[in-house]
Amino acid sequence: MSAPQPKPVRVLLLGGTTEASRMARALAQAGINAVFSYAGRTDTPIPQPLPLRIGGFGGADGLAEYLRAEAITHVIDATHAFAV
C-alpha cells in the first residue's frame, strides 16, 4: 500500500510592503507556486514576479472560498502592520 501523496504547495502572499516584494522574489526564485495579492485600495501596484490579484475577498467567508477554489495550502501575511 502506498502512502498518500502530499498536496502540492500553493501560496497566497498578501502584500503591499517592501517585505512582501522581497518575499515574492524569493518565492519566484525558489520556483514555488504562489499568487501575490494586493488589497483593493492599491492605487499603483508594483509589478511582481508572481501572478497578481488585486482586491479584497469580501470578508472571511470570501477568503475561505478563494483558498478552497485556488487550492491554496499556505498564506503569508506580509501586509503593512497597520493595514485594516
Predicted regions span which residues?
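Glycine-rich, highly charged phosphate/nucleotide-binding loops
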Residues: L50-E70
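N-terminal positively charged helical leader segments and presequences
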Residues: L13, R41, L52, I72-T73
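Structural motif
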Residues: L14, S37, D77-A78
